[in-house]
């Protein structure tokens, strides 16, 4: 499996201010539980605006990036991101290349059997089409389309499930083309190489609001999104931070600023041994 990054620099220190803060207080997670001393190393695939993306200056932005920075700050750690494609994230976590997957990984029981996971965000699947395509309005309207999707994620799994549903109903089904990341999938849609892209509601809504693509179908296969860890002690510490952020209102404020729904759960850790 390729660990090719989508930027020249694999590691990005988010801000010197965050680093200075981490150095001015006592870390709440010992170095023995971290990949890099004093640092919360997080993997991200920044191809999902407004959740995570790279702005015109090359800086990481988005709700999940902000959340990761705040988690690190409250743990008195320096935030550091590794930009990597999703298909490499779980193997990289298991190999100890980063502490935390912070890319909006969908929570499933199968994943929670091999990782420590904290569900924190509600999401669902959308299908984006060209703005000129006004015919697709529901799942049945997707039948026969060539659609693009990121390789290896929940979105690909559900795209194949949708294909199976359509075929079981006696329809043609989908022609599915996988891409290393969502940026490439949306580029293919823009170029007319695919007729639709399967992504998450928040991303499809963003592109629709910009006038780039039309969000034709949304709300499919709703499921919680999580952060994920190999280390149980670190997961417990982050769970405590999220609970504190919910109590003091900062988590709700962050979600509201992006128009996103918070989960109804208690931000507890779910994983092996739980």
PLM regions: where:
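Acidic, polar ligand-binding/catalytic clefts
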Residues: 69, 73, 78-141
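Alpha-to-beta junction loops
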Residues: 41, 77-78, 95-103, 145-146, ...
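A ligand-binding cleft/hinge motif common to bilobed small-molecule-binding domains
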Residues: 88-91, 104-112, 158-162, 188-221
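Ligand-binding cleft/hinge of the Venus flytrap
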Residues: 68-75, 155-178, 208-209
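N-terminal hydrophobic or amphipathic helices and topogenic motifs
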Residues: 2-12, 20-78, 256-274
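Short beta-strand-to-loop elements that line the ligand-binding cleft
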Residues: 78-85, 149, 170-181
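Periplasmic-binding protein-like
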Residues: 46, 122-129, 201, 205-243, ...
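Extended ligand-binding regions for polar small-molecule ligands
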Residues: 24, 65-74, 133-136, 140-154, ...
């Amino acid at each position: 499996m390729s660990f090719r990054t989508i930027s020249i620099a694999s590691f990005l220190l988010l801000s010197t201010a965050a680093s200075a803060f981490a150095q001015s207080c006592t870390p709440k997670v010992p170095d023995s539980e971290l990949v890099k001393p004093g640092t919360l190393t997080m993997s991200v695939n920044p191809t999902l605006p407004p959740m995570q993306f790279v702005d015109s200056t090359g800086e990481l932005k988005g709700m999940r990036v902000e959340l990761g920075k705040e988690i690190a700050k409250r743990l008195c750690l320096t935030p550091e991101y590794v930009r990597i494609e999703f298909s490499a994230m779980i193997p990289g976590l298991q190999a100890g290349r980063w502490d935390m997957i912070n890319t909006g990984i969908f929570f499933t029981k199968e994943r929670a059997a091999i990782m420590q996971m904290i569900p924190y965000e509600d999401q669902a699947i959308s299908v984006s089409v060209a703005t000129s395509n006004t015919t697709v309005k529901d799942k049945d309207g997707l039948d026969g389309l060539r659609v693009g999707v990121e390789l290896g994620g929940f979105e690909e799994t559900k795209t194949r499930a949708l294909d199976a549903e359509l075929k079981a109903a006696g329809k043609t089904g989908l022609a599915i083309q996988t891409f290393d990341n969502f940026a490439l999938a949306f580029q293919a849609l823009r170029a007319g190489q695919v007729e639709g892209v399967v992504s998450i509601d928040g991303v499809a809504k963003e592109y629709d609001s910009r006038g780039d693509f039309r969000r034709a179908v949304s709300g499919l296969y709703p499921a919680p999104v999580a952060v994920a860890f190999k280390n149980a002690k670190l997961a417990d510490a982050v769970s405590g931070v999220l609970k504190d952020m919910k109590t003091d209102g900062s988590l709700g404020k962050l979600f509201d600023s992006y128009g996103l729904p918070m989960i109804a759960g208690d931000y507890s850790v779910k994983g092996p041994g739980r």
